[in-house]
């Protein structure tokens, strides 16, 4: 019996340890098996952060084993007493270590993971789905409709061709992916609209393949899988063996061909469908992470992923021979080559249905049936040959050969990309090249930017103009002249005067747009569209009119064109500018929306690149658009290169600064600062209350959350990721999966974008998320951008106006929108290599920054920086970008978070907090994250950074949340109490047994 009792303490210890193991397993599953994107870098940092606790447990365990063995030399009952201390010590060590980890170094992560379960209410879900339906209904674009093939008659029997008809795309992959668990399939969407579908054809495709390959992966993410860009499609032999075409012809005379293309975070779209050997030789090894195709027939080096595959060509060719009424559904957010739509007389109609989200295929059914009249317009230019664009030779990434000194290691490979086309991106190139005679427009462009058809016809004209020399208001009269109700988009472009060899200018530039309500046949509406003269200014980065660079409105005639797309002018008003207006301090002062006059800030990012110029009819086109020949960092670039290896605090810190006050008791709470100006003295009093540890946590520990600070009444807040909707990273809570950003841009409907922003804020409030890592507004510089689905458009103005509406809707309702990725993150290949993005400042301001400028000036409170570099300087540590432009010029006050810290060799927190960043998107941060944590420079930088984050939070619904001890913490305290009672009782029992045994021994001896 005594031997059995010996095992009781060890059994109790084992049970308690097992309980901790179960909790740990639950935590692991939530973090690494759930929606939280945890990388190996996070895991490594977590192990480092927890290493003292791990070492402590190991040391105690070894010591306990030594004690147990050594106690064997002792006599009873002393041996039993000593050995009883071993399990007690082990259990105490585990308990203390677990508490130190979960209530200390990993508190913020654990707190987020074990947050109370919340959900979006049924009422809010319903309103969100209504908005999603409207976005899809207005964002689907009618590309072709010969012989009024659409809409189809009710009850039409449809043969759906293309494997994608059974596995269509709802969105992309990565942070902007869509939850498809409750999605309406393409087939169900058609059935809901009253169509019948050939079920035998559906079964044929289902049996061919059940899962769609994923074309991108996320490097360094736990459990990453090999990517696959295969376009699944049966061979013609497989079709014929199953008698598919014969049976389909017997079923119906109407065919619907569905073509899908995916995109996502991590990699860009293949420009050549080659085998891995060829790709490795060209791009330095990326092919080891994914396949271009697993179908041998589709290997074709002359084709890109955005063309029909060889198997698809064979299928389309056969369908068009068998059917005289073919409808095509293009299910892709990346602009594809669609010249084949014009090559077959049988193809009567085509629609673009990009990333429709969970409900968008219902909208597709409504459009094909005529219940909804399409009113979408393209957000990109569709060209016949994507391998003949100005960007194609300078997209992807090119390796430097002399980088190890500045990156810290030969393994930290430095890459670069040249934005050689300057301001001539998308339609701005094609319209200008046509005007200069460089291209035959109709042979190059298939569908212009802004293009979209309707089931009805409209008349529109500029009915009246108000022009006071500062702003222009157009009255655009619109009338539905057809026989179907529908909406109309009035697109306003301007053509500025261009002087050969002077400031670069495109021949067509979107400036504003508006959309009517639904107009019944014969009904009219007048749209008032207002913009300012300064909106037409060009940025003079070469100092032609202003020595240090400035926005310039040159004298001359400005043609204000009412258009149906970037190429088709319907009416014109000519605005005259009598003399140059130069928006700098030496001439006419800053633009009305700038806090200080814009001047050159990014000259270091121009590099030694030859940029495309309109001069002499694009005389330098061949030279400018050629692939880069120089693969060496210049001496200046090496000197400017920013990384952890080159960081020197002395370059940023004021040597005369004094240590800021910390830990003061001024009695202020964050809620007291709501609505208080950023530079109000009260902010200094509040910041004085923060301890160094508070400052460290607020700035370094920012992965999908903000830590709580009890002293100022700030409760911990969560942030959610993804432009397609609200998806908590810590629990299953989610709102509807909305159509992708491209589809929202294709609505050309700013009030609708604002409604989505308002709706997103409502959803976030219900699941306790104070921040949203969205919208994403990088530019479709190339159709091959992996995350184009997540970004709005090729146009900075369309992107900016859409984002401004969405962000203002969300911000006005208390949500912090972290607009991303700031800036020039227009591709995904090599983004984690600090890819040096070389561009001139005119293109930076007129194209890429324009998309961010408008939502920031509309009241945006958050920014997410990008992984790439601006020239040789990481965007997340670029003072010129984050301080000089964002804060000083645009007047931004708020939070600036980095993108995920997956490459710490250059994503250096020491640099970020000194240049305008406010927090790091990182987990498991140790005190070593900042060098010299308690120095004057670091504390001052952390204080300034915390100011921005707290200002944003003070003006969000985060301040309405009560500060309370989380339930899981209370549970931890309760478990600690139980363990303490057990340990004390255990020790008492051991001592009592020892005393009793000792007395018995003494009695025996007597």
Range-by-range predicted roles:
Residues 1-543, 547, 551-561, 565-566, ...:
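Glycoside hydrolase catalytic-domain context in secreted enzymes
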Residues 568-591:
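Short beta-strand elements
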């Amino acid at each position: 019996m005594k031997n059995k009792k010996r095992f009781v303490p060890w059994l109790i210890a084992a049970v308690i340890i097992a309980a901790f193991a179960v909790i740990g397993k639950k935590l692991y599953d939530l973090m690494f098996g759930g929606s939280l994107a945890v990388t190996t870098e996070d895991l490594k940092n977590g192990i480092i952060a927890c290493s003292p606790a791990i070492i402590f447990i190991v040391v105690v365990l070894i010591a306990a084993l030594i004690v147990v063995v050594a106690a064997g030399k002792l006599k009873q009952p002393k041996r039993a007493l000593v050995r009883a201390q071993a399990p007690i010590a082990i259990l105490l060590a585990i308990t203390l270590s677990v508490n130190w980890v979960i209530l200390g170094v990993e508190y913020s992560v654990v707190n987020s993971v074990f947050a109370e379960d919340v959900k979006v209410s049924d009422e809010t879900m319903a309103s969100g789905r209504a908005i999603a339906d409207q976005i899809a209904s207005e964002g689907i674009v009618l590309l072709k409709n010969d012989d009024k093939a659409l809409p189809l008659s009710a009850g039409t029997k449809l043969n759906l061709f293309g494997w994608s008809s059974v596995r269509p795309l709802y969105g992309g992959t990565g942070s902007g992916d869509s939850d498809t668990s409750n999605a309406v399939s393409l087939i169900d969407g058609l059935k809901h609209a009253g169509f019948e579908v050939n079920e035998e054809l559906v079964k044929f495709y289902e049996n061919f393949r059940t899962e769609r390959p994923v074309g991108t992966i996320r490097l360094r993410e736990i459990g990453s899988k090999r990517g696959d860009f295969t376009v699944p499609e049966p061979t013609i032999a497989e079709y014929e063996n199953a008698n598919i075409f014969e049976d389909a012809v017997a079923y119906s005379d109407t065919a619907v061909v569905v073509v899908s293309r995916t995109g996502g975070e991590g990699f860009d779209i293949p420009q050549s469908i080659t085998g891995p050997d060829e790709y490795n030789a060209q791009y330095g090894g990326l092919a080891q992470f994914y396949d271009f195709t697993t179908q041998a027939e589709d290997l074709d080096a002359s084709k890109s992923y955005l063309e029909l595959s060889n198997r698809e060509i064979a299928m389309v060719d056969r369908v068009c021979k068998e059917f005289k009424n073919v409808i095509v559904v293009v299910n892709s957010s990346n602009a594809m080559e669609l010249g084949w739509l014009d090559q077959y007389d049988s193809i009567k109609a085509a629609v673009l249905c990009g990333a429709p989200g969970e409900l968008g295929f219902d909208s597709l059914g409504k459009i094909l049936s005529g219940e909804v009249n399409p009113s979408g317009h393209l957000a990109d230019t569709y060209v016949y040959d994507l391998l003949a664009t100005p960007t194609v030779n300078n997209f992807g990434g090119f390796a430097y050969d002399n980088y190890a000194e500045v990156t810290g290691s030969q393994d930290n490979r430095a890459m670069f990309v040249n934005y050689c086309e300057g301001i001539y991106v998308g339609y701005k190139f094609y319209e200008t090249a046509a005007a200069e005679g460089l291209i035959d427009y109709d042979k190059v462009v298939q569908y212009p930017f802004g293009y979209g058809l309707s089931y009805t016809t409209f008349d529109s004209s500029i009915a009246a103009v108000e022009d006071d020399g500062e702003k222009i208001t157009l009255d655009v009269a619109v009338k539905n002249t057809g026989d179907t109700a529908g909406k109309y988009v009035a697109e306003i472009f301007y053509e500025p005067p261009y002087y050969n060899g002077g400031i670069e200018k495109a021949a067509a530039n979107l400036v504003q747009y508006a959309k009517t309500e639904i107009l019944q046949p014969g009904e009219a509406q007048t749209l008032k569209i207002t913009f300012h003269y300064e909106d037409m200014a060009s940025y003079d980065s070469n100092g032609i009119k202003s020595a240090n660079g400035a926005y310039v409105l040159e004298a001359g005639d400005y043609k204000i064109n009412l258009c149906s797309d970037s190429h088709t002018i319907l009416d014109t008003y000519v605005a005259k500018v009598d003399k140059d207006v130069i928006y700098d301090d030496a001439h006419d002062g800053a633009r009305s929306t700038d806090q200080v006059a814009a001047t050159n800030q990014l000259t270091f990012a121009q590099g030694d690149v030859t940029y495309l110029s309109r001069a002499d009819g694009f005389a330098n086109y061949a030279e400018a658009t050629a692939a880069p020949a120089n693969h060496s960092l210049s001496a200046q670039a090496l000197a400017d290169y920013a990384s952890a290896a080159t960081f020197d605090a002395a370059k940023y810190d004021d040597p005369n600064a004094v240590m800021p006050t910390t830990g003061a008791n001024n009695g202020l709470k964050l809620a007291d600062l709501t609505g208080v100006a950023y530079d109000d003295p009260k902010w200094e009093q509040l910041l004085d209350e923060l301890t160094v540890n508070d400052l460290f946590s607020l700035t370094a520990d920012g992965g999908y959350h903000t830590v709580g600070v009890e002293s100022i009444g700030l409760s911990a807040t969560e942030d959610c990721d993804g432009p397609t909707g609200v998806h908590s990273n810590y629990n299953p809570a989610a709102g509807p999966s909305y159509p992708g950003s491209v589809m929202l841009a294709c609505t050309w409907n700013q009030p609708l974008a604002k409604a989505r922003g308002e709706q997103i804020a409502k959803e976030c409030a219900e699941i306790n998320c104070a921040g949203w890592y969205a919208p994403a507004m990088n530019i479709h510089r190339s159709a091959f951008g992996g995350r184009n689905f997540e970004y709005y458009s090729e146009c900075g103005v369309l992107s900016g106006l859409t984002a401004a509406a969405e962000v203002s809707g969300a911000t006005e309702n208390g949500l912090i929108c972290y607009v991303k990725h700031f800036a020039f993150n227009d591709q995904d290949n090599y983004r984690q290599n600090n890819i040096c993005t070389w561009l001139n400042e005119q293109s930076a301001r007129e194209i890429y920054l324009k998309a961010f400028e408008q939502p920031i000036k509309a009241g945006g409170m958050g920014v997410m920086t990008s992984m790439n570099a601006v020239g040789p300087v990481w965007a997340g540590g670029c003072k010129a970008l984050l301080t000089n432009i964002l804060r000083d010029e645009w007047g931004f006050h708020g939070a600036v978070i980095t993108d995920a810290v997956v490459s710490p060799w250059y994503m250096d927190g020491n640099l970020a907090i000194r240049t305008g960043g406010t927090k790091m998107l990182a987990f498991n941060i140790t005190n070593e994250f900042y060098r010299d944590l308690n120095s004057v420079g670091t504390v001052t930088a952390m204080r300034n950074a915390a100011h921005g984050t707290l200002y944003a939070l003070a003006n969000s619904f985060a301040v309405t949340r009560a500060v309370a001890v989380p339930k899981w913490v209370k549970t931890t305290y309760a478990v600690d109490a139980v363990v303490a009672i057990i340990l004390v009782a255990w020790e008492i029992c051991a001592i009592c047994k020892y005393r009793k045994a000792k007395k018995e021994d003494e009695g025996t001896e007597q």
